Every structure is written in C-alpha cells, then in structure tokens.
Amino acid sequence: MARKSSILKVQGVVDAIRKQLDDRLAIDRRAMDVFRWALGCLLVLEFGGRMMVAEGLLSDQGVFPFEIWQTFPHATWPWFSSILALSSSTLWVHVCLSCGMVCSLMLIFGKQLRWVSWALLILLHSLQARNPWTNYAADKLLFLLLFWACFVFAVQPDENSRATRWMGFPAWGLRLQLCVLYLFSVARKSGSTWVEGSAVRYALEIDQYSQPLGKWLLEGPMIWLQMLTWITLLVEWFGPLMLLARSVRIRWMGVASLAFLQLGFLLTMDLGWFPWVCLLGLLPHVPLSHRKEEIQPLEMNVHAWGMSTRVAGWMVLWMLLWNLAMNFTYPDTLKSRLPSVLSRGIECLRMDQYWGMFSPNPMIHDGWFVIAATLSDGEVVDLLDPTRKEVWAKPLHVPATFPGDRWREFMMMLYDYPDQAHLWPLVAKWFQHRWEQAHPGQSGVRSMRVVYMMEKTLPEGVASPEKEQLWPEDPSGQGSSEPGDG
C-alpha cells in the first residue's frame, strides 16, 4: 500500500507539472490557424522558387547530376530517401515540386490536414535531400516547424468543438523549437567580437550577405554598431524566455522584440528565407485567448491519437537533451558514437540540430566569385553576372551577382570543400550555356576560369582582395591571361 501511495504521489506531481506546462505552452487556436496559413504560403513559395532553379541544381542537366549525388561523400541524407531519386529528369523534379505546391494550397485551406501535412514533410525532405548543398539554416527550421505541425494537426479539434487552445506534447514542440534555436545560438556567441561589441560590424562586412543599408551602417560611428551588437545579444537571450512567460503582455513583448530583430536582419542582410521562417515560428506564440471560460483543452483528440502524442513527447525530450549536449560537442562527433540506424533517423528528422549562426564570431574571410570567360573576339565577361562592365572590380551588391540564394549557397559550399573541385567545370559550363542562350549570334566562349576574390576583414577596414583560382580550364592550371588580371 505504501508503495502504491508513493507511486500515486509521484504521478500526481508529474500530472501537476504537465498541467502547468500545458497551460504555459498551449497554442491559441486562432494563432494556429494563422500559422497554418502562413506555413502553407511559405511552402508554396519554397516549392515554386525551387522550380525556378530545378534544371540547374536538381537535375541531370545541371551541376549536380544523379551519378554524383549517389556517391556524394558530403550528403546529409542517403540519396534513396528522396522520391526525387525515382528519376533524374527535370520533368520529374517539376512534377514533385508541383505536388508540393498543391499540398501547400490544401494546407492553406485546411483540407485533409492529417495526411497533407505528412505528405508535405516527405516532399520537403525529398527536395532538401536532392542537393544538400543548396540548403541552409532556414531549410532545417522550416522542416522542423512543419514536423511539429504534423503532430499538432493529428490532434485537430472537431469543427463544432468549443476548444480554443491546442495542448499536449505536439504544442510543446512547436512552441519550444524557436526558443531552442535562439537560446542555444546565443549561448555559442562567446567570441571576443560579441564581448567587445564589434560582431555586427564583422557580420555586415560579409559581402555575400550585406545589403545597401548594412553597408550604410558601416559608415556610421562605431558606437552604433556596438549598441546593435549588444542589443542583438539581449534580444536573443531574453526574447525566447519572454515567449514562455504566462503573462500575455510579456509574451507580446517577446514576440515584438524578436520580430523587430528579424526585420532588422531583412533590411541589412540578405539571409534568404531565414528571417521569414523565424517570423513564421513566432506565430504559435501569439496569445489571443483571454476568456478562461472558453478554454477547453483538446483532451478528447489526444486520447484518440495517443501514440502520435507520445512520440511527440519523446521527440521534445530528445530535442532538449541533444541541444544541451551540443554545448560540449558537435553533431558529427556525437552521431559517430550512435548506432547507424539511429544516426540516420535523427538526420532525416532534422533532430541533429546545431544552431551556430555567427558564432562564436562572424567569419572574417569572404568575397565574391568571378566566372571569367574570354570570348573569341578577345572580350572578357563575367558569366556569373554578365551585366558588369569591370570584371575584376568589386560588385556594388554581391548577393545580386547570383541567380538566387540557392546558387549562392551551393557555390559557397563548393568553395569550402576543395575535394569536390571537380564540380567547378559543371558550374562554369552551366553559366556558359546560360550566357550563350541569352546572347545568340555573339562571339563564342574561347576559355573560362573560376576565380574567388577573397577579402579579409581586419580590426580596422578590409584588406585588398586576393585572387584564388578555383578551376582553370587548361591542364597547366594557370588559366588565360586576361585584362584586369592584377
């Protein structure tokens, strides 16, 4: 009897704690509806945007053909986990992306949420797995938000239900995901630039990301940049904590502060989808319900989908423990100690999280690419950005030289992994083909070379750029002598 009484007491304490967390981490039903709509819109744009670069980055006609994908040593996920592996044609890629857009529209209109959300998750994984070097932090966060939403949609209330909040482990995961990103990211910002207040200045000097407004800020007093650095740290530390507060006013303060932080990123840096996905992740935190008499937890559907809820609970626990472990090690190190099946599983579910944006310090080496082509008439053009008159001069806006953020990410990853330099000829020939299509009847390309103009950010100013030739066409590796080659 004493043992049974002790078990009941422990169970009572656990239930009380869970009830408190349920109340604190519940999601307002109307906020969830807005989140679903925004998630669907973002996925429509994501699948549509990928369709624009499908031929170049996702098919055999581009820079990452199927035979390279099958043996790619830096693949995050096995090639056979993607339904895009069923065919290497551009048409099949377009069919899959079109299916993703249709499912995204169904998500927007709330049709068949339980199976549509999982179908979207499979399609999104297949897309991201097809060319892992086109993904960045925004893609992992988008996948994770959709992942948690799949569990939430499995516990959806009936149309006639008076329930106004979503409770349970699925809601916990969706609420905690963004908080985990901010808290563990800022915990790694321990470098000297963050302490002394120069981190924002170094970040804005990164040509691959900097926007005109960011360049303008660099011309202002250093005290501005120091204040922005410390404000960023404060918001990333206290913003997510305010999101977890019980007080509606404090939660609104957390939502507003983190939203303004992302708007600042949008105005000063070209980070692709990342600010938009972070803004999407804020929507489940919006507190809209005030009248307690209307609150009816979704317990009736939690029991109906008990297995799904329990799986979500274990995944929440894994997410927290994994991110805590990442303060002492790195994902690849820890995964190498796990059984391969478990390691592959957490990779496919994006549970091998590591949020290290601009940590411990922003990078100090950056620059821009030049695909220099000498035409048959002797003229030299940059195939990456043919509109530029001075091939070797620094572009006014480096992000605009790329056809899009996916190409920028792919080329930067290719630069970071010299063992894959054999892909540079495919990149050069792709841009040659694009240039010849846009300029029919003009002089043909006689020779090409891919050059990276590397700059180093110094404590004061920026060093002169250094040319680093990544791919010469001729066997000697010297490239051709061209005007402006200093």
Please give the residue ranges for each predicted region:
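Alpha-helical membrane-anchoring segments
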Residues: 2-486
